[in-house]
Regions:
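Long, compositionally biased stretches
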Residues: 2-73, 91-93, 98
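A conserved hydrophobic position in a structured secondary element of the catalytic/binding core
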Residues: 29, 78-79
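Short alpha-helix capping/helix-loop boundary micro-motifs
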Residues: 39-41, 80-85
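Short, charged beta-turn/beta-strand-edge "cap" motif at the junction between a beta-strand
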Residues: 83, 100-102
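Short, solvent-exposed hinge/capping segments at secondary-structure junctions
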Residues: 87-89
Length: 102
């Protein structure tokens, strides 16, 4: 069993379909990383299946949660407006993200 998961990946920033404004932006974690995280966090889960993580995107770092996406079977990471503004990114951009499960 895994004891720790840190993953670095590139992904496209996208807007959640349920909210047409640009306030809900996400990146999708790769399938293999999502499987590793699911294995590491097996058992009782927090609300909505959330998993606490530490994130680095560009020069920005923060603690947040990732959430399982029933459509893809992967976890998704919300990227708040202050981070997008600080990094000069918007929906459609490809970003490099480092995620560490806490």
């Amino acid at each position: 069993m895994l004891s720790h998961v840190i993953v670095e990946f590139e992904a496209q920033l996208w807007i959640w379909d349920a909210r047409r404004d640009d306030s809900w932006n996400f990146v999708t974690l790769p399938a293999e990383a999502s499987d590793d995280i699911r294995e590491l966090t097996a058992g009782p889960r927090r609300g909505f299946g959330a998993v606490k993580v530490r994130v680095r995107l560009g020069t920005s770092t923060w603690a947040t949660s990732i959430f399982p996406d029933s459509k893809t079977g992967c976890y998704v990471l919300p990227v708040k407006r202050p981070v997008r503004t600080a990094e000069g990114i918007e929906a459609g951009d490809t970003v490099t993200v480092k995620v560490e499960v806490l």
